[in-house]
Amino acid sequence: MFSKVSLALLLSFGLFTAGCTTRDLSAEAGNKTKVGIVFDIGGKDDRSFNAAAYVGALQAKKEFPIVLRDVEPGDPTAIEPAQRAFAQYGYNLITGVGFAQGPILTEVAKDYPQLHFVLIDSVAKSPNVASLIFKEHEGSFLVGMIAAYTNKTGKIGFVGGMDIPLIHRFQTGYEEGARYVKPDIAVLVNYVGITDTAWNNPGKGRELANSQYERGADVIFQAAGNSGLGVFDAAESYKKFAIGVDSNQNWVKPGFILTSMMKRIDTAVYSVIKDEVEGKFKGGVHVYGLENQGVDYALDEYNKPLIPQEVIDKVEQAKKDIIAGKIRVTDAMAK
């Protein structure tokens, strides 16, 4: 029986209307697979990390018989109640978006061994959790190369969100890619903060980018969630370049986004939902890198005029060399 507590939680998150009974909810679901997503505090409209997960889920909804509900907590303290609300109602697949949800999701998954869970950007050692991990350092190496080939000042920049090992992986790959092209290039580095709020502070992101542009950087790679939108604003203001992250963000500020380091979170989320619907869910660690199109750089109508073909050719060759093991990119989280 669906408890009054969990119903109250679902209502508080706006998942269902107050007039909707559990019988109504069961009728709506029918034989459909119930999928719940708990985003991080950046929300699904961040045009980056969360948005990519949402795109993948929406694509799955179009193709498969699922009921899809989501929660945008807005505050870290709301994450656990949201996960538990989905679990108490018996959602078949519950996704936690972002490494910060790892400890909570691990405990919730243990309490509900009959359900399946997805954790993005962290590893939960539980057989009913699919942990989706990306080789961000590989994709960051490629955009670092593009930044260096574009650079005219001898300085480029990096603005990270929360100062944590996961984002160091982006930074290190970017630095190594840039120095693969220009060994003496200087990389200016700043982080928005050390708490979860660092992902949702565009004003601080813009402030840091302004400083880097003032100090001579002409390309800045942001790996900062919603805070990265402030970096884009600075790029437009200074008429310099920025590099997007997670999703293809080239369209956000056309002409000022040099490229984007894409994590195919959309593809990964779609795939795990597909597996759940087809009865093929597999727990454990799922790794996405260049070799399986899990990461890449974005090239489209918005940025093709910004990158010469000879640069694209060199980056494509480097991609092949990374896949073949001829170029080894440091994984900052493996140190």
Residue ranges, per PLM feature:
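A residue-level marker of the well-folded mature domains of exported/periplasmic proteins
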Residues: R23-K335
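C-terminal motif of bacterial Sec signal peptides marking the signal peptidase cleavage site
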Residues: F16-G19
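Bacterial N-terminal signal peptides that target proteins for export
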Residues: M1-L7
